[in-house]
Amino acid sequence: MTLAQSNLLLLLTAAMWGSSFVLQKMAMDIMEPFIYNALRFTLAALCLMPIRYFRRGNIDVIKSTDKRHMLIGTISAGTLMFFAVAFQQIGIKETTVSNTGFITGLYIVFVPMIGVALGHKYNPKIWLAILIACSGLYLLSGMDGLYMKKGDLFILISAFFWGTHLIVIDMISHRHHPIAFAIRQFFVCGILSLFAALITGESLIVPSMEGWFYICISGVVAIALGYTFQIYGQKVTPPSQAALIFSTEAVFSAVAGIYFLGEVLGSKALIGCLLMLGGSLMAQFYPPLNHRMTEQKSLS
């Protein structure tokens, strides 16, 4: 695969992820968030299992110590993913697809904030990037003083968990095959979502074929296929380029929200989106100064 083909594959992935916010919002009109997450992440895990099976011959046998590491890692990552998608689905009911896409993109800004707490050192300019992104959030959300709309607040909490999830993935996934790791964390997320659905008394019955359509497209295309595209694309595209390409996810979400749902971005909100995107992109140029670089295990 050439670099141009790889970049195109990652751009397609960003488009799939950004556009899928429309389906996530429409799904909330006919079903509840926890059972929706339970079904789509379980379906995604099942879709990835054949890929893992046919590639198993190229992977070394996992040692017992790595099995324990895999278990702890996937439970941690899957739990963080559960909280991230739970807050995201609850929040998207109360806000627009455009806001969801751009606020979710702030996970890139949360990474250095969390990293500092873990002892990572950053270029001081990273705080300028964070300030720019936060200014954009203020404009996009139409905040009155320190008050933020409930839906946007839930999406912001979701972005925090996505940032934490990214740090955990960076710390542990380099020791394991990416598809195997993904399957396990998707199952953990799906199981926890099912428990949450039971505890909160959600209906476990999908009310219509329309609901199954949203589940299948999200589970098969956005999660399973999107993740696979990401893995193959990042085998060729450098991390810095990949991060820039993935930042377009927010743009695709805004375009999808405007085209499919008739959402409107006012001038203040549009400026906020640009500031958030700019702050997130700026944050990409200041990685931790004292953090090791890791590589994912190859699929081949």
Give residue ranges: language-model regions.
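Glycine-/small-residue-enriched transmembrane alpha-helix faces in small-molecule transporters
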Residues: 1-35, 87, 144-171, 295-300
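Loop-to-transmembrane-helix transition segments
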Residues: 5-15, 59-87, 150-158, 197, ...
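Helix-helix packing/entry segments at the starts of transmembrane helices
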Residues: 14, 37-39, 100-106, 169-190, ...
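Juxtamembrane helix-loop-helix junctions in multi-pass membrane proteins
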Residues: 15-46, 62, 96-99, 164-188, ...
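Hydrophobic/small/kink-forming positions within alpha-helical transmembrane segments
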Residues: 18, 22, 78, 82, ...
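Specific transmembrane alpha-helical segments of multi-pass solute transporters/efflux pumps
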Residues: 20-21, 49-100, 104, 139, ...
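C-terminal-most transmembrane helix of multi-pass membrane proteins
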Residues: 41, 49-57, 211-213, 247-300
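Hydrophobic transmembrane alpha-helices of multi-pass small-molecule transport proteins
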Residues: 48, 122-142, 162, 193, ...
